[in-house]
Swiss-Prot record:
Secreted is among the record's keywords: yes
Stated name of the protein: Pesticidal crystal-like protein Cry16Aa
Domain of life: Bacteria
Protein's gene: cry16Aa
Organism: Paraclostridium bifermentans (Clostridium bifermentans)
Summary of the function given for this chain in its UniProt record: Toxin active on mosquito larvae of the species Aedes aegypti, Culex pipiens and Anopheles stephensi.
Main location: secreted
Length: 613
């Protein structure tokens, strides 16, 4: 019996690694940014420019993006086209650098005489973005070069954000042809919507084309989704926080709750529809949870190999002791068991040692996990001593991945075809791994110093009654993860015994001094009706608002677009005490009107002090 080594983790090119530096920058600066003090404004554009155009090789990041685009779309650009893209990206980069230098000179010295230069540079770089960004849409290769287009679009939106923050001080709006800040603000909203829709449409086009090509396997689909989630979906999901009227305070961003998948281990090509592979290798939409432990079951005699495993997840209610278990393969008292606990640590990479037959991998002999605690490792089974220790490198970087530089932690270990596979040493066992972004916290924290963003998939209980239904559905790409669907259907001429109601239980943990604080509450949601009301409850206190229609359709589970979602504020503040309340309840009440009604809510809780919307 031979043993080969296989590894599973999230492959990072230098282009992908740079994008996560951009995302981390936006996360960190947005959490600490004080819009009320112009002198403490962090330089988001300045930091991003240093990431994307590194010295000494300023083409390295964008060259990596082009290579990634070619790989995942199976389309190669000509050398001349690549050279043109790099020249154009450098040209855009220089324009942004000139603006950034003028901006820094003004803000460092706060000298009114330097405003003219800032406005000139702003208008110059804004003009090239408005008129020339289509240089990054190469005909028939739009999806291939989409990672570059996205980064330029993101910089443009950040530029417009600067315009919203400083435009009055610069007398900028009339210089740009707008009557006032409000008209400029509407332009910013339109541009945000355009970039999000444009990038999402190209992402979906590329994915559809891959699925239609019979030469592509599930590996190709997984790789495309992974890379383009990093390059496109994650980026468009955070663009809405650039809205300075909605997010006018520091924000605890909790947007990127979606799972991403590394390439399957021991992939078995069964020549089945892509939709069937998705069921085998991916997790269906579900409430957010954190991996608590994995138990590995090994046969007690004969050749040792992995017969089964149990994933245990904990929800966002930190006071609840129960765990959700998912079972794979063979398990029970007839097998030896080893358990790896993740209750206070994360696994950010793992390594496989497989049994092989005819040089093909079959069953798993050992797995090595790299974990965040002291840069340590945990090993299931016994790896062959002839194999070297596995260390994941970020391609193009000299440094190794470690407990500081990782970006995603392990969420699920999945045995494909679990209900059909025969577990023996010579039967190929294929495994899939999902990962979640490290910036997502294990519960919902409420601070008096931040806008507290709460994706409603970070809940623990969904409850419905009568003709109502509440569930988790797959998000449309720009939401950062899955969504909650609150839905009712009342057949004609039938009257329920009571009103129709759906309820969401939201675990919280307060992070403010003893006593109670008043919070404003904002919902971002999509709704195909205006029948009913929403109530948010904290202990004995509650606030209500009427449901407002945001789009018009009679379809069940419609394809949601960015423009379907709107922000709505509760008219009253909600009083939350620092102790004694560990849950909020969001309730949807529907009247007796006949028809189908659907709501897709998201939640944020800003502190009221110095808050305006």
């Amino acid at each position: 019996m031979n043993t080969n080594i296989f590894s599973t983790h999230l492959e990072f090119s230098k282009g992908v690694a740079s994008v996560f530096k951009v995302i981390d920058t936006i996360h960190n600066i947005s959490k600490n940014n004080n819009f009320n003090n112009i002198l403490t404004q962090d330089f988001i554009i300045d930091t991003i420019l240093s990431i994307l155009w590194e010295d000494p090789n300023e083409n390295e990041i964008f060259s990596s993006m082009i290579e990634d685009g070619e790989t995942i779309t199976n389309k190669n650009l000509s050398a001349q086209t690549k050279e043109g893209l790099l020249l154009n990206s450098n040209s855009f980069g220089l324009k942004f650098k000139y603006y950034n230098n003028a901006f820094r000179s003004w803000i460092d010295n706060y000298n009114p005489t330097s405003i003219d230069d800032v406005v000139y540079r702003f208008k110059d770089v804004n003009s090239i973005c408005e008129n020339n960004i289509n240089e990054f849409k190469v005909k028939n290769y739009e999806v291939t070069v989409l990672p570059i287009y996205m980064q330029i679009a993101n910089l443009h939106l950040l530029l417009l954000r600067d315009g919203m923050i400083y435009g009055d001080a610069w007398n900028l709006y009339r210089e740009l042809g707008f009557s006032d800040q409000d008209s400029f603000y509407n332009h910013v909203l339109d541009k945000t919507k355009f970039y999000i829709n444009d990038c999402l449409n190209y992402y979906n086009t590329g994915l559809s084309n891959l699925k239609l090509d019979p030469n592509n396997s599930w590996i190709d689909i997984t790789r495309y989704c992974r890379f383009m989630t990093f390059y496109i979906l994650d980026m468009i999901s955070i663009c809405p926080i650039y809205d300075t009227k909605v997010y006018d305070k520091p924000i605890n961003m909790q947007t990127l709750t979606r799972k991403v998948y590394s390439d399957p281990v021991n992939f078995i090509d069964e020549n089945i529809p892509i939709s069937e592979y998705e069921k085998m290798y991916n997790i269906s939409p579900e409430l957010f949870s954190t991996l608590f432990s994995i138990s590995f079951y090994t046969n007690k005699s004969g050749n040792k190999f992995l017969n089964g495993h149990v994933n245990r997840h904990v929800g966002t209610d930190l006071n609840y002791n129960g765990l959700r278990e998912t079972h794979y393969g063979n398990y029970g008292s007839n097998y030896e068991v080893e358990s790896m606990a993740f209750d206070d640590i994360k696994a950010y990479s793992n390594n496989y040692f497989n049994n092989t037959q005819n040089n093909n991998p079959t069953s798993v002999k050992s797995i090595k996990f790299l974990i965040t605690k002291n840069n340590d490792e945990w090993i299931y089974g016994e790896p062959d001593s002839s194999n070297i220790d596995f260390t994941r490198n970020i391609q193009g970087y000299l440094s190794n991945l470690n407990n500081e530089s990782y970006t995603h932690s392990l969420s699920d270990m999945i045995l494909a075809n679990n209900d059909k596979i025969q577990i023996n040493i010579d039967t190929p066992h294929s495994y899939s791994y999902s990962w979640i972004y490290k910036g997502i916290e294990d519960t919902n924290y409420i601070s008096d110093k931040l806008i507290n963003q709460i994706p409603l998939v970070k809940e623990v209980k969904l409850k419905s009654r009568h003709y109502s239904e509440i569930s988790v559905i797959k998000g449309p790409g720009f939401t950062g993860g899955d969504l909650i669907l609150s839905k009712v259907h009342k057949p004609a001429n039938q009257i329920p015994a009571q009103y129709m109601k759906n309820k969401i239980t939201i675990p919280i943990k307060t992070k403010f001094p003893a006593g109670s604080q008043d919070f404003k509450v904002r919902l971002c949601y999509a709704s195909n009706h205006d029948i009913g009301l929403i109530r948010l409850i904290a202990g004995s206190k509650y606030i209500t608002t009427n449901i407002q229609q945001t789009f018009n359709t009679t379809e069940n589970n419609p394809s949601l677009i960015y423009d379907d979602f709107k922000y709505f504020n509760f008219n009253e503040t909600l009083s939350i005490t620092s102790s004694g309340i560990d849950e909020l309840y969001l309730e949807f009440y529907y009247s007796y009107t006949d028809g189908n009604f659907e709501d897709f809510p998201k939640l944020s809780i800003p502190y009221t002090r110095n808050y305006s919307c």
